[in-house]
Design a protein with these regions (language model features):
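A short, charge-rich alpha-helical start-of-domain segment used by transcription regulators
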Residues: 11-35, 45, 127
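Sigma70-family region 2
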Residues: 15, 53-70, 89-91, 168
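C-terminal flanking helix
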Residues: 30, 34, 55, 123, ...
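Structural recognition of an alpha-helix C-terminal capping motif at a helix-to-coil junction
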Residues: 35, 49-56, 60, 69-81
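Arg/Lys-rich amphipathic alpha helix in sigma70-family domain 2
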Residues: 66, 77-97, 160
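DNA-recognition helix of helix-turn-helix
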Residues: 80, 84, 147-169
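Internal acidic/polar
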Residues: 85, 92-119, 139
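A short pre-motif secondary-structure segment
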Residues: 129-133
């Protein structure tokens, strides 16, 4: 009986997440998802492919979303996993992208353009944490769920990344 109630709840959620709501989510968050995938993929075309595939997966698996409040972190996790999976399939990992592809001036809201260079010099796992926490505003708990690592690990890696960035001055 308990299973039927759970299934009924999922069906209700699936019906409640309309294609229009999903389209609104995509319109609002697509830029963040592309930048997140770009942080992993390092190529705009690959990042776009990863996001497109992740959004398809999210739509197909929308009944697995337990709470609409968690949609942003849930889709971000799917995007990260899809981008990493695509790299593994191609057996190609590029760690550093040419700085020519980065803006030479500060982006709106980020007055210190030099920090972008310093962030890019971090190890990939540290850079991903910095982007998720400081740039995209995910909580440490959400990052823990997205990357499948303990919250304590997120905290310690963020601390270490902050120390590295402070020492780069």
């Amino acid at each position: 009986m308990h299973w039927k109630r759970a299934q009924k709840g999922r069906n209700k959620l699936r019906r409640s997440l309309t294609s229009r709501q999903f389209e609104q989510f995509v319109a609002t968050e697509r830029g963040m998802l592309v930048r997140l995938a770009m942080n992993i993929q390092h190529h705009p075309e690959d990042a776009d492919d990863a996001v497109a595939e992740a959004l398809c997966k999210a739509w197909e698996r929308r009944e697995q979303l337990r709470s609409p409040d968690k949609m942003r972190s849930w889709v971000a996790k799917i995007t990260v996993n899809t981008a990493l999976s695509m790299i593994q399939k191609r057996k190609r990992v590029e760690l550093v992208e040419s700085m020519d592809d980065y803006p030479t001036t500060a982006e709106p809201g980020y007055p210190h353009s030099g920090i972008w260079h310093e962030i890019e010099s971090l190890a990939e796992q540290d850079r991903t944490l910095v982007y998720l926490y400081y740039i995209y505003g995910f909580s440490q708990k959400e990052i823990s769920a997205i990357l499948n690592i303990p919250t304590g690990t997120v905290k310690s890696r963020l601390y270490a990344a902050r120390q590295k960035l402070k020492n780069c001055r």
